[in-house]
Amino acid sequence: MKTYERFLNYVRIHTASSEDSSSVPTTERQFDLAKLLVKELHAIGVENARVDDKCYVYASVAATPGCENCPAIGFIAHMDTVPDFSGENVQPRIIENYDGGDVVLGTSGRVLSPKKLPHLPSLKGKTLIVTDGTTVLGGDDKAGIAEIMTAIERVISENRPHGKLCIGFTPDEEVGSGADNFNVAEFGADFAYTVDGGAEGEIEYENFNAAAAKIVVNGFNIHPGDSKNKMINALLVAMELNSMLPDETPANTEGYEGFFHLTDMSGNVERAEMDYIIRDHSEAIMTARKATLAHAVKILNEKYGSGTVECTVRDQYLNMVEKIRPCMHLIDNAVEAAKSIGLVPKVAPIRGGTDGARLSFMGLPCPNLGTGDFACHGPYEHVTVEGMEKCTELVLLLIDKYSKAAK
């Protein structure tokens, strides 16, 4: 089966995770894809494929004769889609020989346009897969799953020599808990790659340090006509707090620049809540960002009274760069493999995180590879058939390279 054919099957399975669930996985529907993947792995000859009670899929292919002393290499992707935009009833549309211009997305009123996404003309002539404008496409990360599955099928059917190969598919990556219950020992790899990036040719081993902040503002409500020097409007205090933070938002930053991102805000005069994510590649600057937020809270409590603003900060993940630097062969081999299939390698920091960032600190060095997916997490998400084929080839070449390496 071709990569894009698998992909089209996978995206039709609703697998969105949930921020509001404490169960593992956060949504039972993720098992629907997990069970299908196990069935497909069995069908291509990976008889030990299994899914555990927490919805983690594990499988391995034993080394071929003569490659038993090669490193065990793993490939990992996640099954869930983002909960922030619908992933239900995905209706992918294939556009052959894309002209590089506007694409009307079904009857949604949305248009995929180079005016908003200037990379689109570079995809001219390729076969584009888009949404109908009402859902995500699910390329994040079902493109990665399809690429891994196709590569493993080809390794087996073409009798390519290889060291031990380890395959893992995780739940709940989009809500930050994809690595929480990942069993590194059971997975069995010496090194791994997540296949969860953007454009084909992306190779990433630096990611944000990440934290989440929960702000609760406790106001004092009284009749507006009798509120002089008495009322504390929680909504206005919340707005004041936001105004005290640097103007370093996702829309104003790029590359190695970090940010404060207000993701949710709700409330009334009596009580308001705000959710922030805080990101930076530098651990020192990340510490300073937390201090900036704490200082703003302190100033507001001095102004409006102790306990007016409550702030809880929770660390989420760390920059994996320190764990990858001793294993730079992972990056060097990926760069060489990309060049050999005509891709221009783009080694750049991830403005986000992956399961691999967490796994790297759990003893499994795990940089990230592109999947050919663009504009993820919303209705403008799209991939190209050609891009996914290149990403599949990249996985195959990495398997080939490590079949010639010794531990």
Question: What do these predicted ranges mean?
Answer:
Residues 19-20, 48, 161-164, 247-261, ...:
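Flexible, glycine/charged-enriched surface loops at secondary-structure junctions
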Residues 130-138, 344-348, 378-379:
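Short pre-catalytic strand/loop immediately N-terminal to key active-site residues, enriched for Gly-Thr
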